[in-house]
Amino acid sequence: MSTKKGGPKAASGKGQALLPGSKLRATAGKPRESRQLQRKASHPSKGSFSENPQAPAAPTAEDKAAIVIQCAFRQYLARRELARRCQERQEYLDEMEKLQKEAYLALVRQEQEAARRQREKEEAEERARREELQRRRRLLEAAFEGDLGEIRQVLKEVEQLMTREGVGYDEDGKARRLQRRVATVECEDSHGNTPLSEAAAGGQTMAIQLLAELGANPNTKGAFGRTPLYRAAFGGHLEAVEELLKIGADPRMYADDGSTPEQVASLAAVASVLQSWDLSLTEAMLKNMEAEQQRRAQEAQKHKENEAKRINIKVQQLAKEQQKCQKELQQAYCELNRRIMEHDKCERKFMGNTELTLQAIKDAEAQVDRLQQEAQKAEETLAMARLELREQTPEDEDTEPGLKCRVTELHDVLMKDVGDRIRADGRWPLVIDPSGQAATFLRYQDTNYVDTLNPEHLRPERIRLALLGALRYGKPLVFDLRQVNLFPVVQQQLEVVQTGLAQALLNRGLLAKEGYLSLLRPTDGPEYDPSQFQEARLEN
């Protein structure tokens, strides 16, 4: 019934016109009626085409109120979104400022800590130097005065110091202690006088005997080229002269003025003893002393070799630890790159869970920072051990190979090879630049750049194409090792591309007899046809 009544009213146009919104509201609850209206509206009468369309009615108060409410609500949403974005920006700025302050404070604390360690090291060295000078002064004074207890006390302090330094009592430890003891009893004052010379000048026979037993040389020259025997004879100390002659003092040695101990003897008895002394005994004792010195030199050399061997083993162990740290750091870098790629993928595909990926990136960055510190510490420890090894074997030290140049000169040195240094050397250049400017320079040159910390760059196919492109177009192939020693990883990836490729690339065997053609694949395309490789480009 309702559909029949509603139809004519809608078609005749005599009833009150409805707004589109009100019409929808009127027909929303009656689907059959709405469909009937649509059918009848789609088949109007012939007379309706000639009639003028009726103008829409003005919006009602309800419509106006709805529009006002919608505008106000949208303004509220916009203000709230603006406030949220402003708050996020302010939080971001505050966080960046906080991080900058923390980084600055961390840098200041790091510099302060380094300065404190350096200051403590310098203070310890200065304190050790003062203590050494004090022991030397005490030993010289005790020798002149004949204070045997003080001499033994000084030597005991030296033994205790070596014990604190970790010197043991094994064969090497005993050799080091003997060297230190001999060096102590043969110390010199500002004039070059030794404790034995001071004891001779003071006429202290017992001190002379004790110092000789400890390994002191009786024929050293001090101020004005005077020997201990010269000073004892000049002072008229007969017993001291006799004791010095017994331990091997040579009465034939001259001072700087050309005088001998016999000539400056202040007592006739002293001159008589020196004149009547059998020089054959002196010759025999000199031979014995020379043999003893040779034995000590051999022991010192043996100890030096053992010490160098020990340090070499230590360096090898530290090198293994450093390589382990570098490998862990490389894995951490790869993990960080994977996390970044996962985050970018989530953002591109609107997959959500970006908070989780960001947290994973933060965790990976923290892991990288920790491993960087460990790797840096291992590198510093290894460098100090290598320095100690070089100090132990200075004769094996060679001049540093290579050529030092500024970054502004890299284009002439690497790209143009001015002077044909690289061509004459026959090896591929290795650029070492702690500042990283050389890597930036090479990255923006016309090179095939491979970042060894990027797993995508280390894919075998990418390395193969980079190498082929370098040979085909005469472009440099650059492996950027960054701050990590990844050369073994590069070699491993080259071996994955082709067995023996790393060695063939290093010794230039890849260029001989067109060996590079083995890298070609059927899918490479016509630009990599064997005829496209030119000899002039291969030589570069």
UniProtKB/Swiss-Prot annotation:
Region described as Disordered: 1-62
Assigned keywords, A-Z: ANK repeat, Coiled coil, Repeat
InterPro entries: Ankyrin_rpt (IPR002110), Ankyrin_rpt-contain_sf (IPR036770), IQ_motif_EF-hand-BS (IPR000048), P-loop_NTPase (IPR027417)
Ranges in a coiled coil: 281-388
Keyword Repeat part of the UniProt annotation: yes
Pfam families: Ank_2 (PF12796), IQ (PF00612)
IQ domain ranges (all copies): 62-91
Superkingdom of origin organism: Eukaryota
Ranges of Low complexity composition bias in the record: 1-17
ANK repeat residues: 191-220, 224-253
Name this polypeptide is given: IQ motif and ankyrin repeat domain-containing protein 1
Gene: Iqank1
